[in-house]
């Protein structure tokens, strides 16, 4: 990794080799920045406070060896990244304003993409992870991870049934809690439908009545106009001397008929005049019929206006016209059917809920059985690891139990609480020595014991669910003496099959490393900065001496440091 302008680190290259690398340095020198840098490359949260004072941004670049056929390589290439000679190049930039950018294989990617790949690349463990192990849900997750497919299969089936049950319960609760609102809505719909049914409107009736009302309201004027028009076309019997349209057209017809044989063009015009005559007679006849049929009956007009008023009362409430009113009635009838079916739906949902609870109880039992079997193997494996970490008489076990809940699922004749991960409460217990009762690690484990339990769990995982790189950030806190030597020895064995990076303050642990990096702080009087360098030979002895006695030149400390290095070399 290359780190620039991150915290106290100005510009440093961290050369992480295969095997076991220990990162050491005085308190405040910036060892944690190495962990933070790797965290940023793995999609961790960015913070403007990480940027070195006076710098515009902090940059971390990393090169991670990845086999071309590895799942992480395939996923990276799907995102548009390219491998560089079997390695994946990752960079992360954090601005002084807190903005963050990520690049993967030369391509800009969302930070979430780095986090997606992280689990396949590096397992990071620090003191916060130790505290996390004190939580019951994390202990259950650890057991499920160890169990693998034996728990993953039943858990997937359980999770699907749980999802379906929650959906049914939510719908049932919604219908039940909204019963009053839905009843009020049904009453309003029923009232509206009854009101519309009482009027019995027909489609288009409002338009027809409007036209009829207009006609009846102007009946006298319409009749007079029709009579005048009829007289103009067909003549007025009371005025035999008057000239009408039909007479004039007939005269024109006779004049043309007398000579039409002499010119086809004139004959055609004569035909058209004949058509005009026919049209005039037809229109005149219809005008006469219109005038005769027109009824200026005031009773009919009153009835029409009354009907229109009834229709208007509906359009004021239910739609802009009768077509909209009828559409509202159709939709409301369908909605009313739905609302009136609530009781039936509640019965259906209740039956479905009970059936799903019964199914979930069976799946929860299968999950409990799988966890119980895996817990015995997991506890035995962790106990065996603790024996190699200077806790030869410690015993680890798991308590798997359920809590009574009348609203829960039935398992083995008991009704117990359940959740998205089953009905089990899983708790990790530790008996540190013979005769000691097994107690929850949250209550009975010291800091040093908790560190070793955490390491033992991780080592067991390395054998069942390995990743290429492990980073431990001072997980040896609270440990010293022989226990520290055993931790160093166990980490060295883990490094035979994976890359292991440890940030440590214990010389006994650092001595077992294949490579030791020193994070050191310098001050030129105005600016404080930290750098990282590889320790070799005499420099490494001096650093181990400082870690042992606080003095680099103490002969006793130097002798002890050389002895630690020799012991570690012999152990390899």
UniProtKB/Swiss-Prot annotation:
One GO cellular component term noted in the UniProt record for this chain: bacterial nucleoid
GO biological process, one term: DNA repair
Known function: May be involved in recombinational repair of damaged DNA.
Protein origin, superkingdom: Bacteria
Biological source species: Streptomyces coelicolor (strain ATCC BAA-471 / A3(2) / M145)
GO molecular function terms noted in the UniProt entry: ATP binding
Cross-referenced SUPFAM superfamilies: P-loop containing nucleoside triphosphate hydrolases (SSF52540)
Similarity section: Belongs to the RecN family.
Binding-site positions, ATP: 25-32
Keywords, comma-separated and alphabetical: ATP-binding, DNA damage, DNA repair, Nucleotide-binding
InterPro entries: DNA_recomb/repair_RecN, P-loop_NTPase, RecF/RecN/SMC_N
Protein's name in the database: DNA repair protein RecN
Pfam families reported in the protein's UniProt record: SMC_N
């Amino acid at each position: 990794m290359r780190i620039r302008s991150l915290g106290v680190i100005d510009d440093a290259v961290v050369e992480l080799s295969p095997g076991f690398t220990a990162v050491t340095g005085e308190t405040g020198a910036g060892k944690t920045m190495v962990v933070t840098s790797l965290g940023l490359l793995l999609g961790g949260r960015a913070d403007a406070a990480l940027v070195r004072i006076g710098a515009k941004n902090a940059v971390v670049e990393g090169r991670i060896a990845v086999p071309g056929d590895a799942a992480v390589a395939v996923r990276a290439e799907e995102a548009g990244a390219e491998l560089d000679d079997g390695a994946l190049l990752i960079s992360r930039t954090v601005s002084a304003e807190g903005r963050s950018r990520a690049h993967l294989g030369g391509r800009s990617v969302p930070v979430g993409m780095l986090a997606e790949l992280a689990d396949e690349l590096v397992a990071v463990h620090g003191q916060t992870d130790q505290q996390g192990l004190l939580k019951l849900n994390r202990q259950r997750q650890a057991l499920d991870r160890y169990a693998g497919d034996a728990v993953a299969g039943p858990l997937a089936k359980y999770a699907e049934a749980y999802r379906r049950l929650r959906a049914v319960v939510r719908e049932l609760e919604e219908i039940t809690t909204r019963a009053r609102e839905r009843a009020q809505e049904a009453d309003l719909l029923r009232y509206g439908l009854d009101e519309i049914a009482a009027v019995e409107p027909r489609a288009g009736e409002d338009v027809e009545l409007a036209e009829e009302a207009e006609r009846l309201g102007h009946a006298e004027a319409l009749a007079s106009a029709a009579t005048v028009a009829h007289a103009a076309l067909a003549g007025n019997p009371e005025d035999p001397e008057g000239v009408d349209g039909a007479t004039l057209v007939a005269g024109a017809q006779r004049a043309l008929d007398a000579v039409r044989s002499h010119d086809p063009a004139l004959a055609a015009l004569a035909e058209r005049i004949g058509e005009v005559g026919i049209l005039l007679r037809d229109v005149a006849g219809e005008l006469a019929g219109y005038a005769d049929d027109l009824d200026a009956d005031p009773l009919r007009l009153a009835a029409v206006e009354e009907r229109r008023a009834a229709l208007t009362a509906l359009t004021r409430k239910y739609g802009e016209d009768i077509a909209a009113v009828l559409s509202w009635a159709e939709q409301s009838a369908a909605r009313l059917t739905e609302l009136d079916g609530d009781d039936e739906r509640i019965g259906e949902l209740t039956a479905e809920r009970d059936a799903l609870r019964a199914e979930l109880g069976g799946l929860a039992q299968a999950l409990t059985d799988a966890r119980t079997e895996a817990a015995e193997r997991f506890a035995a494996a962790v106990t065996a690891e603790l024996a190699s970490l200077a806790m030869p008489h410690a015993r680890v076990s798991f308590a798997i139990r359920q809590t009574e809940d009348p609203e829960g699922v039935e398992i083995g004749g008991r009704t117990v609480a359940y959740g998205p991960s089953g009905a089990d409460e899983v708790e990790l217990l530790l008996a540190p020595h013979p005769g000691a009762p097994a107690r929850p690690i949250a209550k009975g484990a010291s800091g040093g014991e908790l560190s070793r339990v955490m390491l033992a769990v991780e080592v067991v995982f390395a054998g069942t669910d390995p990743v290429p790189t492990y980073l431990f950030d001072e997980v040896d806190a609270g440990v010293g003496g022989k226990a520290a030597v055993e931790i160093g020895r166990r980490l060295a064995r883990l490094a035979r099959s994976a890359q292991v990076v440890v940030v440590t303050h214990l010389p006994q642990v650092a001595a077992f490393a294949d490579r030791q990096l020193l994070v050191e702080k310098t001050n030129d009087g105005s600016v404080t900065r930290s750098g990282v360098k590889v320790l070799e030979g005499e420099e490494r002895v001096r650093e181990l001496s400082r870690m042992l006695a606080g003095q680099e030149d103490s002969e006793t400390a130097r002798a002890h440091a050389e002895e630690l290095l020799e012991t570690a070399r012999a152990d390899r």
